[in-house]
């Protein structure tokens, strides 16, 4: 079993792995050639094309989700899990407001443990990169009246049918 320590950074130039006594440390570059990495640039552009401009906090949430997704899809349970299932993952994440996020650590860790069965830890550090909002949002149009998450499972199918 290996503990993973994933360090996201906007000043990291390339993906680097380092094995220590108690963990595998991975430096994860959030920028590639000056653009957001791991699909975040595409998401940013797609949102902007729909006149949606996330705040710095909204961008923090997108980055958190991206790092959780990377960890979940790249760290094999069979190889790195304590019981061939439970993994131990710590994520160091640059955010816009460290104090705000530190108040949410327990909630985020418990939520992810419930959803994945893994042991999660978070360290929030000050983000040294700004999610620029050069354009001004125009008047929003009411294209949608509500949203529903749909995973394809029976419970979300029933919920979606009830909305129709």
Task: Give the location of each predicted region.
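Hydrophobic/small residue at the entry helix of a nucleotide-binding pocket
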Residues: 155-156
């Amino acid at each position: 079993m290996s503990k993973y320590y994933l360090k996201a950074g906007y000043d990291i130039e390339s993906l680097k792995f380092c094995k220590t006594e108690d963990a595998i440390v991975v430096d994860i570059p959030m920028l590639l050639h000056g653009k957001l990495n791991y699909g975040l640039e595409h998401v940013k552009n797609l949102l902007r094309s729909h006149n949606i401009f996330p705040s710095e906090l909204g961008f923090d949430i997108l980055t958190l989700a991206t790092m959780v997704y990377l960890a979940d899809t790249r760290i094999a349970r069979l190889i790195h899990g304590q019981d061939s299932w439970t993994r131990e993952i710590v994520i160091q994440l640059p955010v816009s407001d460290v104090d705000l996020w530190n108040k949410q650590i327990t909630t985020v860790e418990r939520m992810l443990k419930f959803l994945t069965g893994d042991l999660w830890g978070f360290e929030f550090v000050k983000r040294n990169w700004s999610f620029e909002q050069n354009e001004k949002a125009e008047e929003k149009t009411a294209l949608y009246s509500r949203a529903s998450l749909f995973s394809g499972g029976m419970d979300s199918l029933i919920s979606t049918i009830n909305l129709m």
